A protein has these predicted regions:
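Solvent-exposed interaction patches of small proteins and small membrane subunits
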Residues: 1-154
């Protein structure tokens, strides 16, 4: 069976996001194995910084690519006209269609990402709290991606 260009774009976007989803999980396992806590976070060694940088990069890429590539590609494959939709409208439409559990939760995940990547508090405990929030958000992103995977394979 031949795929439409929209279906091919959707498959490409899904594969891209899946590639980003694996790397944060790997770095998170390594971070947990190292036992990085608030005290250690204030004085990270070179290897720990690399792990956190890898996590931060892949986490932000996953969030960005899901929002800018996978979600629009999903809507296009469903026959929706995304050109006239704002990002918030796309999230709301995906929620209506049952592809996204909550547009508001997605917005919260975006806010966590923005705080993690753009705000640099001086206090190490605040930075560590933002890392913890990003770790939890990464797990939620993986769950959202799994929801999209199940819908795409239907």
């Amino acid at each position: 069976m031949n795929q439409t260009p929209e279906q091919m774009a959707l498959q490409h976007s899904l594969a891209l996001c899946q590639g980003h989803a694996d790397a944060p999980q790997d770095s998170l396992q390594d971070i947990k194995a190292r036992g990085i806590g608030v005290d250690e976070y204030a004085n990270l060694g070179k290897e720990d910084r690399r792990l956190l940088d890898q996590f931060a990069y892949r986490y932000t890429r996953l969030q960005d690519d899901m929002g800018t590539k996978l979600m629009p590609a999903s809507l296009k494959a469903l026959g929706e006209n995304v050109a006239a939709m704002s990002a918030l409208d796309r999230f709301a439409r995906l929620e209506q269609l049952g592809w996204l559990a909550s547009a508001d939760e997605w917005q919260t995940l975006r806010q966590i990402r923005n705080q993690f990547t753009h705000d640099y508090p001086n206090n190490p405990s605040e930075r560590f709290e933002r890392l913890q929030a990003a770790v939890n958000a990464a797990a939620q992103l993986t769950a959202v991606l799994a929801q999209f995977q199940s819908k795409i394979k239907m």
